[in-house]
Amino acid sequence: LRLVGSEMCIRDRIQLEIGVQSTNGATIREIHRTMQLERLKEVVKEVQKHENIHEHLDLIAGLPFEDYDTFAKSFDEIYELRPNQLQLGFLKVLKGSYMYEHAKEYEIEYHSRPPYEVLKTKWLPYEDVLKIRQVEEMLEVYYNSGQFEITMKVLGVLFKSAFFMFQELGKYYERNGYFGMSHARIRRSEILLEFIKETFAGDITAGEQRNITETGKKADHLEILDIIKESLIFDLYYRENCKSRPAWAKDLSVWKQVTRAYCKNGKQSHVECFSYRFPDKGERVLKELPKRAGKPLYALFDYTDRDPLDHQAKVTWIMEDEDAGLCSH
């Protein structure tokens, strides 16, 4: 990358995988690794500026000197970089490896069959390993899938800790018996909306007080729900022209004239009406919640012009202009 300059790389030809494993200094020293965390962050941000390289960063649960809280801190530090994929794995204790040789010292228990993944350590009890596995599943479904990109950006304004958010979402799945079931994409959206409603509509718990931002505490919960409903609709059409629509979706016939005027590619395009304008692709982190527009906004999703990196449709915003009528931006 240094030789050719990442801006010269052809889009979607390179995938960069960075094995972070942990940001906990004691852990990094114990596994005999050297890492300059701030330098790592600089490199990742430099790569991201050009938006042409798919970057994967990984973390490993079950390493020495890593307990639940320090792992959560590692998770949040790496999540803040918003890589294309944040891969959360579990320590594998392979025969002859350093971890195998020190398993007794670290009080590591692990599966006796492949892939020999950790069950507990001196620092991480079995119960915490199970909780991290729930976080991993929620991360895969709602972040790594790329199917909820805009909604994840909005939730980043509401939650201080992404780890806490995925942890609480996992608890919500467990309470309602949602784990172990096959859920369609729209059902995943419904569950996420249910979770947000439960979190922000009632009294905020002590844990939520610590992990929810001031914006999340002060914002009207109905406004939050309106934004999330629209961001979930945006996410659905960002990837595909959905045949089915969630129950809260607006009636398509309301803007059928706009659809006729702008949808020139049949099923390869779609127009949706929004009250909020959502961030452009290059804006990985939102600083504030989207603001309600004074007039209806229309997003034109063009599936003939997809981003080769994430396969999302090209989006053109269409706004009402007093003099010119509808105009695209």
Language-model features: locations:
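C-terminal catalytic core of tyrosine-transesterase DNA break-rejoin enzymes
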Residues: 27
